[in-house]
């Protein structure tokens, strides 16, 4: 047997061996993204609890800090998802994660706007008299935008679950939920 024939016969077996030993890139990507989303879902739950306490007794430093923390949380999550290698990953999975990142980038921008607004209130000035209740009213005006982002995120959750079922069947293994689990915000938005 000459070298080219040997390589032609061995190459498929070598590729199969590497795939088994290294794991499927889609499964690896999926699990890493799911781990990131689980971690940041838990962090967002803690942040929402803090915001609920602030809603009952608003303080400008607390509002500014919470909006900064929300923006930081979403930024860190986005950076971690962006750092994942997409080489040889199923395009449907990477497309979902990209759409998810774009949606939550809007949430991050909103949190950054609130942070800047509260910073101005903290500094005071002719246009910004430090008044927590007025600052909270400003949040109220953004509720509609928050609700719109959340509605789109819920639709994205449904798509993620359908994608999870499809890929689990295709790959013949159970995959963890991929989506960023949204905290319950009804009390916060009422």
Where are these regions (language model features)?
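Sec-dependent bacterial lipoprotein signal peptides
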Residues: 1-20
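Generic low-complexity segments that are intrinsically disordered, proline-rich and/or Lys/Arg-biased
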Residues: 5, 13, 59-62, 127, ...
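Generic N-terminal simple sequence motifs
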Residues: 8, 21, 87, 172-173
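Immediate post-signal-peptide N-terminus of mature secreted/exported proteins
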Residues: 22-75, 182-186
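Juxtamembrane amphipathic/coiled-coil helical coupling segments that flank
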Residues: 156-171, 178
